[in-house]
Amino acid sequence: MASGLEDPILERSFKGHKAAITSADFSPNCKQIATASWDTFLMLWSLKPHARAYRYVGHKDVVTSLQFSPQGNLLASASRDRTVRLWVLDRKGKSSEFKAHTAPVRSVDFSADGQLLVTASEDKSIKVWSMFRQRFLYSLYRHTHWVRCAKFSPDGRLIVSCSEDKTIKIWDTTNKQCVNNFSDSVGFANFVDFNPNGTCIASAGSDHAVKIWDIRMNKLLQHYQVHSCGVNCLSFHPLGNSLVTASSDGTVKMLDLIEGRLIYTLQGHTGPVFTVSFSKDGELLTSGGADAQVLIWRTNFIHLHCKDPKRNLKRLHFEASPHLLDIYPRSPHSHEDRKETIEINPKREVMDLQSSSPPVVDVLSFDSTTMTDSTYRAVPGKGEDICRYFLNPLLMPECSSTTVKKRPEDVSDVPSESLRSVPLAVADALEHIMEQLNILTQTVSILEQRLSLTEDKLRDCLENQQKLFSAVQQKS
């Protein structure tokens, strides 16, 4: 049996939310964790010892999903209040709000380059937004029930979505068409995601199952029935060799995708577990659930996967039918001589969890523009400028390769407002002016279209009148 040092351990726990935790994500530099909750708040936790936590207040209903941008300078959140917010992670609470859907928003996901954002909603639609151009791009409509999750592929060319209509769909982002469809007659998927190299998808099912699909051959590769209740979330290890799942049965389970078996059951939560996520380096994973706790686990097997995945691939020709070797790099595994599952229950051990309830600072959302139902359309049209949905230019991600922005390693590292080159009051005034100009431009455009239609109808009337006169003259 492997030594204890090779098994995952509970390293820390955080308490601060007042209700169930719905989503969690590590920052790209692995120094912070953001969590979302039924209490309508987001919280930002530092992994530094004795650091304070920040509670972000802005949503008016359950926060269902969140994700850091790849650059780490923004945090996107989705809520049952039908809004998506983009947060700048500082003490000012600056965020921008836009209403992209007509029903609760279930998930948000950035593309790998940070230039696109995909949202999924209970209005049965998936919407894609450009962060660089600040524009709504397009909608995807094929689901017939609530869409629970939508994710970009690693290369950004595909989107996978799952719905309560019991289907999983693959979308081509170039032609905006559904190119693949997986159906299930038993249950629906609560969560879906691509593996790190984008050749497979994994689904977390309401039927207690975890399934791995090959999207090139439209084929089910692996099926795991390891939970006794619905599976709510899953996360691939960055190298793709393993998968961690969260379930309403109160456990987090780790699967070895090379050997196709369950290797660990992590028990630390009281009640259902709703979210789980690996850190970007694979050394840590976090879980959250109905007990409002955030648990941080150290995986302790990163050294087992440290070899270059490309060198571990055995197959070099991909024209033939796919094999798991095409999908996951084969690496040495510490449990080759053991087939039983290890259950890890930290409650049985005495552990130093380093201030599980750190001091919390409330950060109220600050919006420079207040929108009412009369100032926006709930569902923007294709190509509509959504500049007014963003707080100010300082919120927009810098996509230029010549611009280097400091990553927010800690909230305290963010420069104060006095150091900004554009005063906030001036930015507010300019944004208000731009909003009014945008409305005027749209109004003029609509008037021009109506005038053109009126001219066309008048021309048709004159032509019909002339034809009528000609007919009357011929009869007389």
UniProtKB/Swiss-Prot annotation:
Q: Belongs to which family?
A: Belongs to the WD repeat POC1 family.
Work out whether the entry's keyword set contains Coiled coil: yes
- What UniProt keywords are attached to this protein's entry? Cell projection, Cilium biogenesis/degradation, Coiled coil, Cytoplasm, Cytoskeleton, Phosphoprotein, Repeat, WD repeat
Q: What is this protein called?
A: POC1 centriolar protein homolog B
Which body tissues produce this protein? Expressed in the retina.
> How does this chain assemble?
Interacts with POC1A. Interacts with FAM161A. Interacts with CEP44; the interaction is direct and recruits POC1B to centriolar microtubules. Forms a microtubule-associated complex with POC5, CETN2 and FAM161A. Interacts with CCDC15.
Q: What kind of modification does the protein receive after translation?
A: Phosphorylated in mitotic cells that may be mediated by CDK1.
Question: Where is the signal peptide, in residue numbers?
Answer: none
State which gene encodes it. Poc1b
Q: Which CDD domains match?
A: WD40
Task: Name its GO BP terms in alphabetical order.
Answer: acrosome assembly; cell morphogenesis; cell population proliferation; centriole replication; cilium assembly; homeostasis of number of cells; positive regulation of centriole elongation; retina homeostasis
State one Pfam family annotation.
Answer: WD40
Q: Which PROSITE patterns match?
A: WD_REPEATS_1, WD_REPEATS_2, WD_REPEATS_REGION
Coiled coil ranges (UniProt) are: 429-468
Listed InterPro entries: G-protein_beta_WD-40_rep, WD40/YVTN_repeat-like_dom_sf, WD40_repeat_CS, WD40_repeat_dom_sf, WD40_rpt, WDR55_POC1
- Keyword NAD among UniProt keywords: no
Q: Which SMART domains match?
A: WD40
Role of this protein: Plays an important role in centriole assembly and/or stability and ciliogenesis. Involved in early steps of centriole duplication, as well as in the later steps of centriole length control. Acts in concert with POC1A to ensure centriole integrity and proper mitotic spindle formation. Required for primary cilia formation, ciliary length and also cell proliferation. Required for retinal integrity. Acts as a positive regulator of centriole elongation.
- Compartments reported by the entry: Cytoplasm, Cytoskeleton, Microtubule organizing center, Centrosome, Centriole; Cytoplasm, Cytoskeleton, Cilium basal body; Cytoplasm, Cytoskeleton, Spindle pole
Q: Where are the WD repeats?
A: 16-55, 58-97, 100-139, 142-181, 183-223, 226-265, 268-307
Q: Spell out the GO cellular component terms annotated for this protein, sorted alphabetically and separated by semicolons.
A: centriole; centrosome; ciliary basal body; cytoplasm; spindle pole
